[in-house]
């Protein structure tokens, strides 16, 4: 018997996605198979981050640069928003590089190690934006976006007016021949400003996901914005189904 596990609602007042590739609106609407097939042919994009001093820019990894480019102007002067960051991979390429250095050189850079942990990226954001509000870093495998929005909803229920949600992924570099591994077609950072409201209603049920596979729910969300979809489903990491309703 199908059972509702949880349900909640929220508004998304602003959002922006930044990738290391340049996609047109029509590219976004075509979906994951198209992105995967054409990932090598999309033009490269490198954020300039002109709002940061050169010394501060140099400290940021490629993943961090995408996050800053997506979120910086989105929050404008609201520098002290609580942040929920979600990623399955986070700084996975830095981690593999560190493992290689440890095996071949027997030593690690303390700075590189400190920047390899899961919450390092959002820690850099907090430092450079002087965020003193609550920050959360989580990983939920298949449904990072949904769980991040649920965490934001709980913060709103505690009295916050807005929450910055950031979902970011960078695929493992091809030079690391690891199996099994799911590689996204490109690196991306999706930033959303979340508020209380009924614009989006999400419901998690224990039914099996029987539709065409959704390999990244954040990218699926972006695709559905370009298609003006009002209802869709995404898989939950524990085997359930998220049903989205956009009002």
Segments (PLM) and residue ranges:
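Conserved "HGTGT" condensation-loop signature of ketosynthase/thiolase-family condensing enzymes
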Residues: 1-137, 168-247
């Amino acid at each position: 018997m199908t059972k509702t596990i949880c349900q909640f609602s929220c508004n998304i007042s602003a959002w922006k996605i930044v990738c290391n590739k340049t996609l047109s609106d029509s590219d976004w609407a075509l979906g994951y198979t198209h992105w995967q097939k054409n990932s090598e042919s999309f033009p490269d994009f490198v954020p300039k981050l002109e709002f940061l001093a050169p010394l501060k820019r140099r400290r940021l990894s490629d993943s961090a640069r995408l996050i800053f480019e997506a979120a910086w102007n989105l929050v404008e002067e609201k520098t002290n928003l609580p942040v929920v960051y979600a990623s399955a991979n986070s700084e996975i390429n830095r981690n593999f590089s560190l493992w290689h250095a440890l095996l071949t050189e027997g030593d690690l850079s303390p700075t590189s190690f400190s920047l390899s942990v899961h919450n390092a990226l959002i820690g850099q954001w907090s430092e450079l934006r002087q965020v003193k509000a609550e920050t959360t870093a989580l990983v939920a495998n298949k449904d990072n976006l949904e769980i991040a929005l649920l965490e934001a909803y709980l913060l709103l229920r505690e009295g916050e007016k807005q929450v910055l949600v950031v979902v970011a992924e960078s695929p493992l570099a091809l030079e690391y021949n690891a199996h099994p591994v799911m590689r996204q077609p490109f690196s991306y950072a999706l930033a959303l400003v979340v508020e209380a409201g009924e614009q989006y209603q999400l419901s998690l049920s224990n039914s099996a996901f029987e539709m065409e596979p959704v390999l990244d729910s954040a990218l699926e969300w972006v695709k559905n914005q370009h298609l003006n979809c009002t209802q869709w489903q995404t898989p939950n990491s524990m085997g359930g189904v998220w049903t989205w309703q956009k009002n």
